């Protein structure tokens, strides 16, 4: 819009304030502009800069496009003509409404004053307003971003704090549980498998050193895995010593019974030959019979009584030997077939002796050949017991042991129908590592293995074999 359009637009407002100028001829032009709301609005820097920018764009568009410029100039001419004609015809009406227009102008000026007070940017150019708006938006966005970053940092710190607190509580709970379990396990091991005399002497020797705490204090200073590994190794060692002690006790008892039975067989042999035996017997009953035998050689009644007592003693020793061998057989359950074969050989010898004296009513019923075979069987059983213990001492994997950690084994004619269910109730779910094993078939295969024709056992391995009882706890 060119200058003519502006002049036409302001003509109406000039005429509106014409009467006021006539009534107050002493007022200045500045005061008149201050009371004309349209001029004040146009004089605002923001409006003036905006109008200047719009006018510049309008003129530039007219100059750039000739057709558009011709149309715009024609429109401007029409608007100016219409406005001039309208002002000429509206002059009487404007003169009639002059007081009311003055009142409206005054109210509008007051409202503009308040608006300028509330909106100071109206007194600033558009470039300054745009720059201020950009700065305000940038500050707002920066504040929001900072707030979001602080919230994210706070949430991260809160999450880390909660995680550390939970880790601390969990670690403390696990530590206390591990201490309790290890302590209770060590107490149970000390109770059921006490230390041997050699271990007690070694511990007493170590405690004489400077600044050596008790066993409990030393255990508390060790780590969990060290304590667990030490407990596993100690448990294996004590279990080995315990089982070995049981085997030695059974061996000594069996050999003692075999020695007494051997002396009894020698006594029977002397009785059959009517010779006086040499008093080299350890069993009190055998010594008594040996002492009573010589005086009663000439007394037939006393001779028969001594024979009956000797047979009764032989049967009693055979039964005691049978129970001792059964106890030894119970200790070797789970050992390899070679070790079980030794015990089975001893059992067969004892069964043969028991059959020899089962049907005898007097010493004459015992054949000299059966008596000699019995002595050979006793000597062979004695040697088998020694060989068995030597075999166990040379190579005894702890997985063979059936000691205090296994339930009592009971012989049955046939396996239980619900054997798998019973085993699962004891050991939990079946271990997939052994699911493919057919244990009854393996046991039958072991029993069906032919004996060594040479009567000699295979040589044990020269190297030391590492035996593992609990692979999960072997570090």
Swiss-Prot record:
Disulfide pairs here are none
Q: Name one GO biological process term.
A: negative regulation of lipase activity
Name the PANTHER family for this protein: PERILIPIN, PERILIPIN-5
* Compartment list: Lipid droplet; Cytoplasm; Mitochondrion
SUPFAM superfamilies annotated for this entry?
A: Mannose-6-phosphate receptor binding protein 1 (Tip47), C-terminal domain
Looking at the record, which segments are called Essential for lipid droplet targeting? 1-200
Q: Which gene encodes it?
A: Plin5
Species per Swiss-Prot/TrEMBL record: Rattus norvegicus (Rat)
Q: State the function annotated in the UniProt record.
A: Lipid droplet-associated protein that maintains the balance between lipogenesis and lipolysis and also regulates fatty acid oxidation in oxidative tissues. Recruits mitochondria to the surface of lipid droplets and is involved in lipid droplet homeostasis by regulating both the storage of fatty acids in the form of triglycerides and the release of fatty acids for mitochondrial fatty acid oxidation. In lipid droplet triacylglycerol hydrolysis, plays a role as a scaffolding protein for three major key lipolytic players: ABHD5, PNPLA2 and LIPE.
**What's the name of the protein?**
Perilipin-5
